[in-house]
Regions:
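A short, N-terminal "cap"/entry segment at the start of jelly-roll beta-barrel domains
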Residues: 1-38, 116-165, 247-249
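Conserved short histidine dyad/triad with adjacent acidic residue
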Residues: 23-30, 40-57, 152, 167-182
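A generic "binding-loop/recognition-motif" signal
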Residues: 58, 77, 93-94, 103, ...
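Glycine- and acidic-residue-biased ligand/ion/polar-headgroup-sensing regions
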Residues: 58-70, 75, 183-196, 200
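Extended, hydrophobic interaction surfaces within ordered domains
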Residues: 62, 70-126
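Short acidic-glycine-tyrosine-enriched beta hairpin
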Residues: 76-91, 201-217
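A short hydrophobic beta-strand segment most commonly corresponding to one strand
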Residues: 88, 102-119, 213, 227-245
């Protein structure tokens, strides 16, 4: 992990504390212990089988599938997932992940605010009727321009019932944006491509699997010096628009 001015942090794919329960291995990257205030980011890996069921009593959680396929079970309802699927876990919902494949299932999650009361539950949950809309695929979202040449798509947003967190996918073409800041706390996971984070007079390179934490109000710039597009997964708290950026002198 490299700490930049204003508390911005850039994490390598090897950073984070790993915990394993059953077929679920979780690497917690962004959290209070690593410098964040309220937002978290965890990279989870599920081997074949059914994971333990967990609940966040007080926090919203958003998931994004980066590789593999399986089923997210939420309060007894089943949601088939594949790469590009985003899932909303409401506060108090009991959920677990099923991986019926021989391949590993990879998920990036963000929980806001960090919930110290998160715990494993033993009780099985069953439900009937029409499942609530808690999942969307990025291909089902319209592209939205942010600035002159950058594009994002909402993933988990208010239409899925999420009130505190905004999750999005973003694409950064070659080039360098102006320095700017946001009025929210943000965590980013790099899905594809390589670039540079600039904060004041400091900078740090990143690549696939890296994570970046931006505190509220810190002026920064993400540069793409290469010839291919960077794809990133972002989440921020409180909820809003990824295109809302503010520039000053």
């Amino acid at each position: 992990m490299k700490i930049l001015a204003g508390g911005c942090r850039v994490y390598s794919p090897e950073d984070g504390q790993i915990s394993t329960v059953g077929n679920w291995a979780a690497r917690t990257v962004i959290c209070r212990d690593t410098g964040a205030k309220r937002i978290t980011q965890t990279a989870s890996e599920y081997t074949p089988g059914v994971s333990p069921a967990i609940v966040n009593p007080n926090a919203e959680e958003v998931l994004y599938v980066t590789a593999g396929a399986g089923v997210a079970h939420i309060n007894g309802f089943a949601y088939p997932v594949r790469p590009g699927c985003a899932v909303f876990i409401p506060p108090g919902a009991i959920y677990h992940i099923e991986n019926p494949s021989t391949e590993k299932l990879h998920i990036i999650s963000c929980c806001c605010p960090e919930d110290p009361e998160c715990h494993i539950v033993e009780t099985a949950v069953t439900s009937s009727g029409e499942p609530p809309r808690l999942m969307v695929h990025e291909e089902d979202r319209d592209p939205i321009r942010a600035g002159k040449d950058r594009v994002f798509r909402y993933l988990v947003h208010t239409d899925l019932g999420c009130e505190q967190v905004t999750q999005f996918a973003g694409w950064i073409p070659p080039g360098k944006a102006p320095f700017h800041f946001h009025t929210y706390e943000e965590g980013i996971f790099i899905l594809e491509g390589r670039g540079i984070v600039h904060v004041d007079e400091e900078d740090c390179e990143f690549g696939p699997g890296s994570s970046v934490y931006f505190p509220t109000g810190v002026r920064h710039c993400v540069e793409n010096p290469g010839d291919s597009t960077i794809k990133l997964l972002g989440a921020f708290y409180p909820s809003g628009s990824p295109g809302a950026a503010y520039e000053n002198d």
